[in-house]
């Protein structure tokens, strides 16, 4: 199904307010497996509104219109849609009663303008507005569905939340988001090209995020369990191709999964940070309850701190500089000893913009110390700026941990 979102309001065209409704609606429709092909903004002008809705009828089956349902003379959405459909407006009694009760609490009586908010299009499904006065509505014709929503964001969102289950028909729509790291969007698309191209129901949609990729799977069925089974089957196909990069679902973050995995395995964690300056620890400690797993991080930015706090040999720093594999190993092992943890991560590298070590900017060493020894990951981010190098280093460290921890992991325990 192709959809068009029409936002009504001269204040949007003038830039007085941002069109946040369009973003929210696009995300909502995407989770329902509906492709939004067009966003249109139109002012409070009857002639132009007729033109815009007529064009939307030509290129979309679902037309979602926000704004223009209020009590003023320039709130014209209902009138325009009714006119185009050859229908009339009538008073919805429940909406009228809500408005009247609201006015009574303020010692006011109903005016003609306020009564206007209770008008709905004939044969429309009325969508009660628990966050405001003007109801929304859904109008079905043989060729189109029109969803009319208030322009006030909190009212629009409340109507969608309250009426989601039947707003887009009788089918159950279920979606699931899979999160991936260590693979770019183009590489993931290449690996899943056939699946993305051919899957319709359930469907697959990739989205790039900062150093990550998420896949949204969406299934529609008359029965909820059937839709969930469809998602399970599609997820298995996806993970068969790119499962080594998968780390979680929904809005779960890498540090959340690190903490959960360590907690399940009964492992404790510490860190030693040079170029990241505490960012690795910050990502973990942003999460409540991190102290059950994470013991601390030594931010050893200067070489003297590496020597004094972690016991990194000065001769090693003199011979190899701080940006080296062996120094990363010494930092990780020093942190593991200092904090008495099962695991310790160390990060050292050149974040730029110029190099102090002779190594190329974007060179990073990430070491993981555990009971079986210490592993080192050499990373290069040649085209990144300082902030992105630090961010990617932290995320790569989290992912390195995940690749080396499994639930009930005994081998890494002290």
Curated annotation (Swiss-Prot):
Full protein name: Putative competence-damage inducible protein
Natural source organism: Exiguobacterium sibiricum (strain DSM 17290 / CCUG 55495 / CIP 109462 / JCM 13490 / 255-15)
Coiled-coil region list: none
InterPro entries per the UniProt record, alphabetical: CinA, CinA-like_C, CinA_C, CinA_KH, Competence-induced_CinA, MoaB/Mog-like_dom_sf, MoaB/Mog_dom
One Pfam short name: MoCF_biosynth
Cited HAMAP family: CinA_B
UniProt similarity note: Belongs to the CinA family.
């Amino acid at each position: 199904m192709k959809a068009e979102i029409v936002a009504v309001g001269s204040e949007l065209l003038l830039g007085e307010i941002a069109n946040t409704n369009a973003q929210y609606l696009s995300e909502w429709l995407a989770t329902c497996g509906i492709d939004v092909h067009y966003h249109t903004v139109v002012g409070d002008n009857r002639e132009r509104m007729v033109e815009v809705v007529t064009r939307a009828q030509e290129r979309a089956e679902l037309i979602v219109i926000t704004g223009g349902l209020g009590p003023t003379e320039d709130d014209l959405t209902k009138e325009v849609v009714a006119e185009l459909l050859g229908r009339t407006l009538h008073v919805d009694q429940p909406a009228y009663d809500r408005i009247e009760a609201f006015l009574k609490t303020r010692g006011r009586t109903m005016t003609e303008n306020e009564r206007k908010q209770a008008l709905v299009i004939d044969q429309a499904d009325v969508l009660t507005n628990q966050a405001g006065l003007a109801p929304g509505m859904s109008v079905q014709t043989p060729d189109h569905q029109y969803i009319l929503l208030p322009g006030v964001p909190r009212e629009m969102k409340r109507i969608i939340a309250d009426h989601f289950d039947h707003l887009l028909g009788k089918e159950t729509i279920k979606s699931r988001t899979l999160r991936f790291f260590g693979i770019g969007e183009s590489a993931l698309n290449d690996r899943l090209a056939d699946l993305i191209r051919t899957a319709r129901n359930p469907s697959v949609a990739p989205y790039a995020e900062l150093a990550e990729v998420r896949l949204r799977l969406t299934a529609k069925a008359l029965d909820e369990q059937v839709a969930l089974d469809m998602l399970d089957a599609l997820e298995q196909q996806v993970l068969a191709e790119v499962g080594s990069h998968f780390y979680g679902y929904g809005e779960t973050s890498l540090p959340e999964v690190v903490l959960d995995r360590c907690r399940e395995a009964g492992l404790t964690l510490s860190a030693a940070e040079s170029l990241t300056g505490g960012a690795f620890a910050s990502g973990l400690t942003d999460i409540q309850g991190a102290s059950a797993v994470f013991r601390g991080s030594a931010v050893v930015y200067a070489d003297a701190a590496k020597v004094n706090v972690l016991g990194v040999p000065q001769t090693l720093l003199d011979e190899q500089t701080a940006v080296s594999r062996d120094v990363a190993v010494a930092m990780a092992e020093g942190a593991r000893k200092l904090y008495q943890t099962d695991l310790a991560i160390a990060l050292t590298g050149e974040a730029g913009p110029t190099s102090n070590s002779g190594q190329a900017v974007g060179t990073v060493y990430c070491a993981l110390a555990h009971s079986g020894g210490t592993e080192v990951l050499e990373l290069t981010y040649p085209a990144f700026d300082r902030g992105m190098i630090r961010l990617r280093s932290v995320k790569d460290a989290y992912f390195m941990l995940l690749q080396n921890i499994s639930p009930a992991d005994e081998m890494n325990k002290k």
